[in-house]
């Protein structure tokens, strides 16, 4: 016997369905459910008197026939769609996206539930892929917990701890340091990959770092990003299938932006903080965002442009790059990098899909726990200032939402050759998933899964009689301890998997090789492949893209900010 219920009652019981709209936290962004893979009247839900009970929504299949975990009635927000579905997890990987239940009595079941299945209630929750931050200065290990609690599940960068070189550059230099960092990676519930130092004009110093296990090489101006170093580094990358990231020559000592672009010779490269405040040819490194072989990203301090952005950056830059405020030349160096015109243009270039990625620049002119927040603050600011995108309607901002979520999920995964494992909610990928209450979307996740196991969550008093009493705060869960850390992976080069020195380290976490980094182009950046011709006026710093002036006002107030934080 069937019964009809109204839309509000249905949404409260099973979460939103097709045509329902939802506001993302306190932003002006609205999503609309595009498709519902569950079957009306056959939805599964756990609890007393609910569906997932023996002989009802739970069948008799043995462990090999059923999911290890099912997230029920989840609202998936990913680059490929905004849909309602059950998510099946098996062996730490996403096994199915569709309809869960008991195939013995229910139609259309793609995810079998049995006695061996755990359930996570996704009703009324948003589920996203774990974030990927590709600009990490590994200055302190506490960054990893901070990032995890913000919804980031993969970190790529370089460093060796609070060393002077690491304060300024994302490089783990040389085989000895690389091996020590690989060993350290075993201790953390985070997918990790390390970048070697790419500043060398001969091949062997770079080749040996790739063989030691780095996933890419970083060219940084503080080590000397000369045309010779760029050319040599990209040559090794082409030979060994790893990515190159670059922080180019702010002072234009060894050439101008045209010189650096010429040294690329059409080869793929990831340009960090492509606007320039984080470093790069002054004042026009932003031009690189229009080239087909350049994969441009931002770091989060300039995201979005606010009334405080300029003032904050000057002090931040002096500290991070070991500059002396008593030396006039050092002050001039800092001031040359901070330009309100290019920072404002960066907002718009993100909104139009010319900048493809977002990252942090952790503790080195960036905040490791704010990649997700700053992404959605930028999207909100652009919605308020520029209105709906042409691809959207008055009803929803679905395309804008897909464009922005791609900036910290699938696009960094594609760029660094790890999209076969992470970066989206798709069958066959690692179950790195983040659950959000809609009112807290983008700012405070509820539950973070690593490889199918809960690694972190909001949790109340451990001595309470129920899980919810205050103080409620983020705590590490069982997926963050002991052998369960193997639900995370360590990314390495293909050459490292063949290296007996790496095998001798006896690393505990699975090693996964990066691949396909050299064939990725700007056109492959999902929802973010626009390649305009960008010009910067050398006198006024006015930015134009295909002749259009890119200018916007700084924000005076933002969502996802003080409303959500005591400190």
UniProtKB/Swiss-Prot annotation:
Its EC number is 3.5.1.5. The modification N6-carboxylysine is found at residue 218. The active site is at 321 (proton donor). Pathway: Nitrogen metabolism; urea degradation; CO(2) and NH(3) from urea (urease route): step 1/1. It is found in: Cytoplasm. PROSITE patterns: UREASE_1, UREASE_2, UREASE_3. It is an enzyme of class 3 (hydrolase). Ni(2+) 2 binds at residues 218, 247, 273. Carboxylation allows a single lysine to coordinate two nickel ions. InterPro entries: Amidohydro-rel, Metal-dep_hydrolase_composite, Metal_Hydrolase, Urease_alpha_N_dom, Urease_alpha_subunit, Urease_AS, Urease_asu, Urease_asu_c. Binds 2 nickel ions per subunit. Keywords: Cytoplasm, Hydrolase, Metal-binding, Nickel. Residues 130-567 form the Urease domain. One of its GO terms (cellular component) is cytoplasm. Ni(2+) 1 binds at residues 135, 137, 218, 361. One of its GO terms (molecular function) is urease activity. Its cofactor is Ni cation. Its main location: cytoplasm. The keyword Cytoplasm applies. Pfam families: Amidohydro_1 (PF01979), Urease_alpha (PF00449). Belongs to the metallo-dependent hydrolases superfamily. Urease alpha subunit family. Heterotrimer of UreA (gamma), UreB (beta) and UreC (alpha) subunits. Three heterotrimers associate to form the active enzyme. This is Urease subunit alpha. It comes from Methylobacillus flagellatus (strain ATCC 51484 / DSM 6875 / VKM B-1610 / KT). The gene is ureC.
